[in-house]
Amino acid sequence: MVAVVQADYSRAEALAAWTRLSDEFIGNCYVSVRPRHAPAWEVVVASAAGSLRLEAFKRAHDHDFLDRLAVAIGNWEQKAQRPDHEIAQMLDQVGDYGLMQGMTNPDKGFMHADILLPLLQARDACAIVVRTEPVFQQLGTAFLVRPDLILTAAHVVMDVDAATGRWASTLKNGLAFHFREKPNQREHPTLAIRPAAVALISHALPHGRPPNLLERSLAAPADTCLDYALIRLAQRVSHLRPVEVVDTAAVKQGKPCWAFGFPGGNALMMDVDLVTDIDPGSGRWLHRANVAAGMSGGCCINHEGQVAGLHEGTLDSEDDAKVKRNRGISIAAIRRDQCRDGKDPLKQVASSPSLEFRDPALVDGWYRAGTALAGEAGAAQWRASVEAALRGRNPDATDSLPAYHPWFARADVEKWIDSAAPDERLSLIHGPPGVGKSFCIHLLRGKLDPYADLVVFNPTQTNDMTWSDATGHAAAANASDYRTAAASVRYRAIDDFLGELRDRSAGGTRTCYVAIDFGPAGRQDRFVGTNWVELIAILAAAGWIRVMLIGLDDYERSVMIDRMESRPETDSVKIAESELAPITAAEFRTYAKHLASARGKPAPKQAEMAKYVDSAVVGVAEPMKMVAAVRAAIELEAALS
């Protein structure tokens, strides 16, 4: 290593020289200095960028090193015992979709690493827009701006008045939006979600004539021809993160602009090039990023990593027909148009239901929970019923499990997450075995950003660790089966933990959630008489932290409530209690109708619905009712698909 550093290279060349070292040599160096609880790789990339790294990336690119580096990092992290699913996510982020290449392309400008994450998020938020009737047709691209709202170009989705041949203010029939089934997925988008019954929330008709004959002038009346459509989905997309919409985001002439979309196929394309012209009056700009038919309606990201607008179309240059220019529509102009009547559609309460999670690991957890609840006597029968619901696939083989898992509404819990009063900072979740208490953590994950907004303590940590060890373990976001013997509590650990939470919540300016799952009834001394009580009170006293406690029994809850009411710093904190019960037959019927609507299918007929309800609710003994309802929903979703 010394010889490499002393060689006559520039700073970037010195780092590029590492590309000639063996993987084993670099790996030993890497592992030797890697912290035991290294932060998430995405956080490192977003926070540790600088000019030296960018120069090194360029040199590494010259040596075709980037793909080899991705594989090498995966090998090193595997040796360091990082979970396989995290390694797969890392490889997706550094080795696919051209993101790293766009980051290092010297001809089109460097992407600062601080905007790598916004680009990854924009990639995941994009959907293919298709029409399924009268014949299947791919129309363009759209992107999530809220879990239940999607933004696209109006000319992609708006119908044409047959009498006049002009654009109509109605959506085309048979629309569907194809999303990824999970973040950072290599596979092409396959999850089709339909528009809601009342779908068109706001829009402005296109600037030009159908099908998309754009007027050549950059300038256009901004109040009537912005060519956008904001559409409500039949269900919320809970497994993907929407892009963050900043009303003032804008492009800058001479700075790079990234364009995303699906060019006539199901593979996402991303390219970057410079902005050449801007016309604020029309809410449009021109850029040179390489785009193609099918990318209309996709999002455009500016040089600061913000959504600057959407891609409208391609124009020939007025002075040279061989020179292509691409036109974008400003998000600032779109947002002004959306809010012109004083109402902001992005801030209105979502009316679309959350219907599903997309996570095979969650399905595996459900199957294993059912096995535990069934006990030794009922395990074989439970396995057979799950295998039948999976249409003969082996439920013990995790690679054969579906991604779909139902999201059954928990109104009180979701209301606390979405709209609790400022002083309602403690939620107590309880109920009999098998009603899905621990599943409420997945509701939190589905609504929040786990990296910034949520810290979870699992039953292993609450039952087998001192709270000081558990806080450090949870803050490191490490989900391994770590165990520790009982040890004396270090009170200073709470200061470290609060500091970690404050960092996650932007200095306490955004709400941070802490979910503590005490699991099934455990030792009598697991909670009462321990420092968990004091820790929870300290967290709830912080005005920017909300705490969800899961699985405490009646006596444990009374102890917690007495502690909160006995101190001046916590006596004003309101406590929300939710006693969960299994899903009812009426709730399952409502869920089934919503799911069918989201899949673009008619609701099951009465006899067919009765079959699913019987499987989910009728004749199912406690404590198997909730896991049986999930099984029935999985069977229903497979039939609808």
UniProtKB/Swiss-Prot annotation:
Alphabetized UniProt keyword annotations: Antiviral defense, Cell inner membrane, Cell membrane, Hydrolase, Membrane, Protease, Serine protease, Transmembrane, Transmembrane helix
SUPFAM superfamilies named among the record's database cross-references: P-loop containing nucleoside triphosphate hydrolases, Trypsin-like serine proteases
Source species of the chain: Lysobacter enzymogenes
Record's function text: Possibly a dedicated protease for substrate gasdermin bGSDM; cleaves the bGSDM precursor, releasing the pore-forming moiety, which integrates into the membrane and triggers cell death. Involved in defense against bacteriophages. When this probable 4 gene operon (bGSDM-FE772_23060-FE772_23065-FE772_23070) is inserted into E.coli it provides nearly 100-fold protection against phages T5 and T6 and about 8-fold against phage T4. The operon without bGSDM no longer protects against phage.
Gene Ontology CC entries for this record: plasma membrane
Enzyme class at the top of the EC tree: hydrolase
Ranges that cross the membrane: 532-552
Domain of life: Bacteria
UniProt-recorded name of the protein: Probable serine protease FE772_23065
BP GO terms, sorted: defense response to virus; proteolysis
EC number of the protein: 3.4.21.-
Annotated membrane topology: Single-pass membrane protein
Family under the similarity heading: Belongs to the peptidase S1 family.
InterPro entries: P-loop_NTPase, Peptidase_S1_PA, Peptidase_S1_PA_chymotrypsin
Record note on what altering residue 296 to A does: 4-gene operon no longer protects against phage
